[in-house]
Amino acid sequence: MLHWNPAQYLKFGGERTQVVRDLVHRLSERLDNEQVRRIMDLGSGPGNSTAVLAEAWPQAEITGLDASPTMLEAARAAYPHLRFLAGDIPTWAASATALYDLVFSNSTLQWVPGHTELLPRLLQRVAPGGALGFQIPGNGSAAACRLPRELAALPAWREYFGPGKVTERWTGQMTDFYDLLAPHAAAVEIWETEYFMVVAGVEAIVEWYMGSGLPQYLNALPDDAARARFREQYREGLRAAYPVRRDGRVLFPFKRQFVIARPAAG
């Protein structure tokens, strides 16, 4: 199961927050910014996305929602002037009655099941003239993301990864977003951007995924020795997939998928 470490996640805080800024910039071009009064940030994590939203729309009442106690603690400590609530996204989507000028989510919905019901419900929480805007990683087939799954399926490791041990990411297509939202929307924008991070070596890629999906694989293993072996095999796979460049550094490409949906009138 997923376990979130805010300090580990924020080792790459600049890179993780850049995608928030890019989506917020696009949203600011689409919205009547003076009319943005209420914002919900779903999966607010350590608060970095909520802080960017507050910079863009300082007049708005902004709430961050997250299910991780450690992430909420970090967010409240870093941004005491902002409001953060404990809760999970499907429950909020099914029970919320208020409307928001912006329902926002950064790099979270890939971990949330039931997109067929969830995405239309999120759009229903958007006020007229507002938007649903979210981003998720689009790198599920990239080696760094694929290798833990492949290792877990090997005979040497298979016994440790039974049902419920690992939270699977959403594996649909970008076209699914359009098909799920378009019947309920006045307009849907979808796009993908590939970011190339320059890192010192593959250990930086290991550290990146230690801030997201890799710990759940390591936590499923019986002892530190097994965890060290799994991590080293992961590292070996990364070395083959991400070669060292002429200057001694490594390029780490990372695709991000973006969606903006505007509610239909009436």
Protein language model features and the residues they cover:
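Class I SAM-dependent methyltransferase SAM/SAH-binding core
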Residues: 38-93
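Conserved Class I S-adenosyl-L-methionine
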Residues: 46-48, 168-266
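Helix-to-beta-strand junctions that scaffold the AdoMet/dcAdoMet cofactor pocket
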Residues: 112-113, 126-128
